[in-house]
Amino acid sequence: MWFKNLQLYRFTRPFEHDADSLEKMLQSHLFSPCGSQEMSKFGWISPLGKHAEVLVHEAQGQMLLCAKKEEKVLPAAVIKDMLQEKIDEMEAAQGRALKKKEKESLKEEILHTLLPRAFPRSSQTFLWINPAENYLVVDAGSAKKADDVLSLLRKCTGSLPVVPFALQNPPEITMTEWLNAGAAPGGFVLEDEAELRSALEHGGIIRCKEQDLVTEEIKAHLLADKMVTKLALNWSDTVSFVLADDLSIKRLKFSEELREQNEDVISEDHVARMDADFALMTGELAKFVPELVAALGGEKAE
């Protein structure tokens, strides 16, 4: 349950639903597995795991949701080969080239035949709502995946007035300033990874891993008008992460010292451990998010 990515969204007006009312709303889009002729299914499951039923877990005013997606895997190459074989057979038998609509119909028949035997794969995406501070966070590696979850939530609530966090200064400018200065402000520390992109269209990309970023070599790239588009950072010796120029946070890791604070919770009691971990994680992230935003220059005034 410990988040590995952060996509940050600001409510444009207060989130008015409590856990009980939201629970009822989510019932309209419960997850169920794909039927024999369905390509994908998307819905809500309990964030506390398969042995729990609650769809909204609340701890210290914070809410945790979980969306599950199941998709049938149909290799494109297999479909293409089967379709071409069918087309060749029919064109040879009829002595003419098939029309576009006929080919599309054949493809639908092939999909209809293959779907019941297709292997399903599933993924889960957690969503954290912080009503008191007026934002929500999706544990998704891409904005598209986060948007899918937000769209599902919007279907349940009727409306979801959220927008991505908007900063006064573009993150790439601030990160470039940090690297030029050789240090980040506050409790943030530069680590050993960065991506630098040229401001010019074909100016090149530099990716550094396991490298000291405070060197003349790196400064030379910055002097050549390259901007920092990804930067590995550490916050308060508690959280390490990679910050991107779209304000997305990936490869989020919490320190062992933090995670071990819940070692006294009985591990066999899965729900109790999830509850304790969620409270611990959100307690830390509730401090981390505003400090990061402040270090980056703050949000745009409304």
From Swiss-Prot:
Keywords, A to Z, come to: Cytoplasm, DNA recombination
Tell me the lineage of the source organism.
Answer: Bacteria, Pseudomonadati, Pseudomonadota, Gammaproteobacteria, Aeromonadales
Role this protein plays: May be involved in recombination.
NCBIfam families with a match to the protein in the record: PRK00321.1-3, PRK00321.1-5
Listed GO MF terms: double-stranded DNA binding
One GO cellular component, as annotated: bacterial nucleoid
The entry's family comment says: Belongs to the RdgC family.
What's the protein called, per UniProt?
Answer: Recombination-associated protein RdgC
Highest taxon, organism lineage: Bacteria
A Pfam family this chain is assigned to: RdgC
Biological source species: Tolumonas auensis (strain DSM 9187 / NBRC 110442 / TA 4)
* UniProt-listed InterPro entries: RdgC
Q: Name one GO biological process term.
A: regulation of DNA recombination
Name the major location: cytoplasm
Can you say where in the cell this protein is located? Cytoplasm, Nucleoid
